[in-house]
Amino acid sequence: MNEKYAALKSNVSMLGHLLGNTIQEAHGDEILEKVETIRKLSKSARAGNQADRNNLIEEIKSLPDEQLTPVARAFNQFLNLTNIAEQYHTISRHCDAHVCEPDAINTLFAKLGQNGINKLDTAQAIRELNIELVLTAHPTEITRRTMINKLVKINECLSKLELSDLSYKERHKTEKRLEQLIAQSWHSDVIRKQRPTPLDEAKWGFAVVENSLWEAVPDFLRELDEKLKDYLDQGLPIDARPVHFSSWMGGDRDGNPFVTHTVTREVLLLSRWKAADLYLKDINELISELSMTKCNDTVRQLAGEDEHEPYRAILKQLRTLLSDTKEILDAKINGQKLAVKAPLQSVEQLWDPLFACYQSLRECGMSMIAEGSLLDTLRRVKAFGVHLVRLDIRQESTRHADVLSELTRYLGIGDYNHWSEQDKIAFLTNELASKRPLLPRDWQPSEQVKEVLDTCKIIAAQSREAFGAYVISMAKTASDVLAVHLLLQESGCPYRMDVCPLFETLDDLNNAEAVIKQLMSIDLYRGFIQNHQMVMIGYSDSAKDAGVMAAGWAQYHAMEALVNVAEQEGIELTLFHGRGGTIGRGGAPAHAALLSQPPKSLKGGLRVTEQGEMIRFKLGLPDVAVNSFNMYASAILEANLLPPPEPKQEWRDLMEVLSQVSCEAYRSVVRGEPDFVPYFRQATPELELGKLPLGSRPAKRNPNGGVESLRAIPWIFSWSQNRLLLPAWLGAGEAIQYSIDKGHQALLEEMCREWPFFSTRLGMLEMVYLKCNSEISRYYDERLADKSLLPLGDRLRDQLQSDIKAVLNVENNENLMQSDPWGQESIRLRNIYIEPLNMLQAELLYRTRQAGVVSEALEEALMVTIAGIAAGMRNTG
C-alpha cells in the first residue's frame, strides 16, 4: 500500500491483527498459521511469483474438509473489515485529499458561478430537486441484519480511535470493544441458513432506514440549508423534500411466487409500525427538550389554556397517538382482526402540531431551539411520511393479460390474449370509460388470476401515500399499461396510481417511444395520468440480451426519445432507472452516470433503484449516506443547469456501428456458440447458486429455461464469482477495435474527450477489466470444466486482453484506471484476499461435484466463499 493511504493502511492492519487474535482463540494456532501461509502466498503470487502461485494451489487442495469453512471465513471476514475500513476512510478526518473530494455541492456552486448561471435559476432548481431512491432486495446481499449492526458499531469505534486527545484508558476501552465486536462477528452466523422471506428482506430495508437514513436525511438537509444561505442568501424551505424513499421489498412479485397479497399487506403494516416506532423515539426526545413555557396563541389553543408547559402538552398528545398506532398495528400484524383503524393515518397529523410548535418557538424569540431536534423531526416527517418508505408494486405484463384473457373467455367475448393490439386498446378504453363494473360477482377466477386481483384490492384499501409506482416488467405495448389501470379501477382504487412500464430488452427499449406516443394519443389516458408519466428503463435485462455497449446506447436513445415525446405532448416525465450495482446491470459511479444521460432527462427528478449490497456501500452509514445524497443532488443540479452537449451526428453514427457490432459479437458467443451453455454451467457456480438460500426470489423466471430465462442477477453474479465478468465487457472492446480498424480512432478519441456518455462507458469498462482475473478464470476452467470446453475459455480470455488494449488505445492511457488512483488501490487492496477465496471456491465446487452430494460443511464453506467474493468485488454482484 502506498504511504498516502497511511490511515487506511493502519486501520486495515489493526482490524486484521484483531481478527487474527480471534481466530487463534477460537481455532488454535494451526488454523491461524494456515490462514497466514495462504495470505502470504497469495501476496507473493499477486506480485508475479509463479512458484508461490503453485504452492498456493497445493496448499488449498490439501485442506481437509473440516478446515475449509474456518479458512474461508477468515478471508470473508477480512474483506468485510477491509470494506468497513475503506468506507470509514472516505468520511474520516485523515482521509487523503484525492479520496475525499471537495464537497460536491460547494464545488458545483463555484462551477455555476464561473459559467454565469443566474442565482434565481439555481434557487428554482434546488426547490424542484427530487431524488427518490428505491430500495430493492438483492440475492447477493447475504450479510445478515445482525452482522450489519455490528459493522456499524465497528465503524463507531474507528471514529473514536481517530481522536488524538483520547486518554490511555479511553483508547484501551475502545480497542477492547473493537476486539469484542470482531469476536462477536466471528462467532455469529455470517450467512443465512435458510432462504430469506420477502418479509425478512423488508425488515432488512427498515434496518437501513433506522440505522442510517433516519439520521442522514436531516443531516444532509441541514448542511444543504447552510450552503444555500452562504451561496444564495436564502435557506431551504422547511417543507422541502429533496430526498425520499420507496421500496420493492414485499412489493416486487415479478417471478417471485413468495410475494403474495398477504405478504404485501403485512409489509405495509410493518412499515407503518416501524415509522410510528421511530417517530415515538423522536417525540420522547423532544418532550425532554421542549420544557419552555412561552408560546403563541396557536400553541396555547392546541395545548389547552391551563398547561404550564404547552410544547410538552402537545408532544404528549402525539406520544399517545403514536403509542396507540403501534399497539393497533402490532395486533393486526399478529393476526388479530380489528375493525378499528390505526389512529395515525396522514402526514398532517404529525406535521401540523410539530410545525405549530416550530413557528411558536421562532415567534417567541427561541429560533435556536426551533432549529434543533424539532426541525430534524419535521424534515423526517416530510421525507418518510407515515409509511417510512413507499411501496412499489411490480408484476410481469403477461400476468395482467392472463387476468383479462380468463375474464373475456368467461364472458364469452373471445380470448383477450389472441386479440390484436388495436382490439385490446379499444376494449380497455371502453371499459375504463364505462360506469358499470366489469368483474361478474359469480366469476370464480383461477388461483393465479385471483392473486393479481387480490393485490389490486390491497392497493385500493390503502392510502395513496403508501405506494410509489405500479411497475409493469416486460412491458411491450400500450395495452400493457391500460390493462393495469383497468384492473386497479375494477378493484375500487379511489386514486390514480403511477403505472410505470418497464422497458427491458433491446427491442422494447427501441420501441418505448412508439408505446408512449400511442398512449398520449388516447384522450381518456391523458385524463387518467393528470399530465405525469413515469417510465422505467431496464438496465440489467437489456445488457443480458445485447451486451453492455448496445444496451447502453439503446438506453440513451430511449431516454432521449421519451424526453422529446414528453416535451411535444406537454407532460411531465419521470425516468425511473433500474440500475444494479454492476456494470452489466447499469452500475456506475452515481455522479458520472447521471452526467452521462441525455440533456433534459433529469428535469423530472431522479428515481433510481438502490440494490442490496450497494445500499450498504452507499447508504449504510449516516455520513456515507450524506455524501451519496450530496453526489446525487450536485449531479442532478449540474445536469439541469449545465446540461451535457447534444451528441454530434458523427458521434451518433459511430455509436450505431459500435452498438451493432458489439451486439453481434456478444450474441455470437452467448447465443451462437454451441459450447457456451455447458461452459457457463461448468466454469461458474451457477448451478450451485440456484440451490443456495441467497434471496427470496428463484434464480430463474422459468425453472425449465436456459440462459435466456436466467434472471440478470444470477447471470452476472455467476461470472463475477469466477472473475471473468463476461457480461460486463463482452462485445464492447471488439466493437471499438473494429472501429479503429475502419479508420475511426480520431473520432473515438474526440468522443472520449467531449461526450460524457461515451467517456463514462469506457471508464466503466476499465473498472471491469481491472476486476477481471484471467489466471483465476483459467483455474476454474482447469479444475471444473470438461477438457473439450477449455479452448472456449482460452478464446474468451484472449478476447479480454485484446479488448483492454483497444480501450487503453482510445483513451491514450498506459494502465487501467490511471486517472483514478484511489479506485485502483481499492481494487488491488482486496485482490490479495479475494484470490484465496476464489481458489477455495473452485476447490469446493470440484469436491461437491465429484461427490455428487453436498455435505453441510461443504455447503457452508461454499456460501462463505460466495459472500466473501461478493464483498471483495463490491459492485459486481
Curated annotation (Swiss-Prot):
Catalytic activity: oxaloacetate + phosphate = phosphoenolpyruvate + hydrogencarbonate
Enzyme Commission number: 4.1.1.31
Family: Belongs to the PEPCase type 1 family.
Organism of derivation: Vibrio vulnificus (strain CMCP6)
Classification via Gene3D superfamilies: Phosphoenolpyruvate/pyruvate domain
HAMAP family the record matches: PEPcase_type1
Encoding gene, per UniProt annotation: ppc
InterPro entries, alphabetized: PEP_COase, PEP_COase_bac/pln-type, PEP_COase_Lys_AS, PEPCASE_His_AS, Pyrv/PenolPyrv_kinase-like_dom
Lineage: Bacteria, Pseudomonadati, Pseudomonadota, Gammaproteobacteria, Vibrionales
The keyword Magnesium is annotated on this UniProt entry: yes
Cellular component GO terms held in the UniProt record: cytosol
The name this protein goes by in its record: Phosphoenolpyruvate carboxylase
Residues annotated as catalytic: 138, 544
Keywords noted in UniProt: Carbon dioxide fixation, Lyase, Magnesium
A UniProt-annotated Pfam family: PEPcase
